[in-house]
Amino acid sequence: MTATSSVKFIILTALLMSVSCKAGAQTIDSARLTAAAIREEQALKARIGVAVLDTASGLIQSYRGHERFPLNSTHKPLLCGVLLSNIDQGKFTLTEKIQFEKEKLVDYSPVTGKFVTPLSMDWQQLCSAAVAYSDNTAANLVAQKVGGPAAVNRFLAAIGDTTTRSDRFEPDLNSSLPGDERDTTTPEAISQTLYKLVLGDVLHSDSRQQLTQWMLDDKVADALLRSVLPPGWRIADKSGAGDYGSRSIISVVWPEKSSPLVIAVYITQTTATMTQSNEAIARIGQAIFSATKGKVN
């Protein structure tokens, strides 16, 4: 697929029911978005994908928006979305406690490592650990609870996402091999799915608020979009990282005086350091935020 910028209408029933498209609604500067992505792509010698869903107009704009990128830890809000959907159906509760042995721990488990048997954690704590702290063992426990990758894929397909795919558990899903479609998404697909989970009607109101809160509480993404967020704006996000220089973030951003944006940025196939990729994502975010501020009436 060629690296082109695309602008298209998204047919999302909940979106069209909840917002009106009218003259003067906020828009994103497509040329600036494309230029920012290409500039960072060339600087990092990377492949970069960006999508911005403007909920005021129902438009999504993207650069490499239909190309596949490694999910890495951006899959964790999806896992907890599936868990919350199960809770909405009465299958179990957030306060249900589980115990797990030390042998269950995998690399990067800053929270769960403190709660092995005889201690316990409930699902609220585990999703907080997975989303806000990117705890890998917590993510695996949630994935196992909902039925593994196959169940995640069934859920995604049921809400209209037949692109994003879950195949493995942490940490194996972070291999990020070029051309490997396992555990991948596209910037446009995951932006639409995140919209449905956080702003749509896929989850009950309480569950939407809970998922949003876990992402608002993100403790590991300060160097990315949060570092350039304008005063008075809010962000709920989840970052990811993997092999082949993969770095990513998905987010819902609430500007101070306009409707939310759903933003996804994915970087892969680069030898850049994580710091360099973080700075690149921040600069892309700055371009998006500046363009948005310039268009708001």
What do the predicted segments below correspond to?
Residues 8-20:
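Bacterial N-terminal signal peptides
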Residues 21-25:
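Sec/Tat signal peptide C-region and signal peptidase I cleavage site
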Residues 41-69, 92:
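Short, conserved catalytic-motif segment at the N-terminal edge
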Residues 47, 119, 140-199:
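Mid-domain, small-residue-enriched loop/turn segments at the edges of structured enzyme/sensor domains
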Residues 55, 94-111, 146-147, 173, ...:
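Acidic helix-start/capping segments at beta-turn-to-alpha-helix junctions
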Residues 58, 70-100, 263:
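Active-site SXXK
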Residues 105-141, 149:
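Conserved catalytic neighborhood of penicillin-recognizing serine enzymes
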